[in-house]
């Protein structure tokens, strides 16, 4: 979706899988300002774990502070994703709540399952929800872009 918004100054980030010989080993967060951070990896000996991944909550905190703090000139934030790993960071949750209650546009992917903040976002009456899967992702992206154009 970000490619379709070229020329617009974006806030937020997307998450990229880290693979070795075809096997997923971790996740890297890439902010639209160019900052990057490895937020989870199978080799991280962390207290916080989601599945087989150790989660670096401090890295998520730093990324949230930088990428999700509202800045003048940014009217649209893209966030991929609001998931279990990201929600281990209270700073991430706090910054997301600030964006959700603010005057900027926000498009985010939200984990299919999850309690706490994940469920809270899905219950919000001021949020539009689309179900995204591999089969419909191009059509849904076009629908969201049209929705944004009318805002």
For the regions a language model picked out, list residue spans one by one.
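Glycine-rich loops and low-complexity Gly/Arg-rich segments
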Residues: 35-40, 52-56, 102-105, 131-135
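Short glycine/proline-enriched coil/turn segments at helix->beta-strand junctions
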Residues: 5-9, 73, 101-102
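Residue-level preference for the first positions of well-ordered beta-strands
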Residues: 11, 76, 105-107
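Short, flexible coil/linker segments at or flanking structured domains
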Residues: 1, 15-20, 43, 48, ...
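Phosphate-binding/switch loop-helix module in NTP-utilizing enzymes
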Residues: 47-93, 97-98
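N-terminal phosphate/diphosphate-binding loop that engages ATP/GTP or pyrophosphate donors
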Residues: 2-52
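Surface-exposed beta-strand edges and their flanking turn/coil or helix-capping segments
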Residues: 25-28, 40-44, 52-56, 100, ...
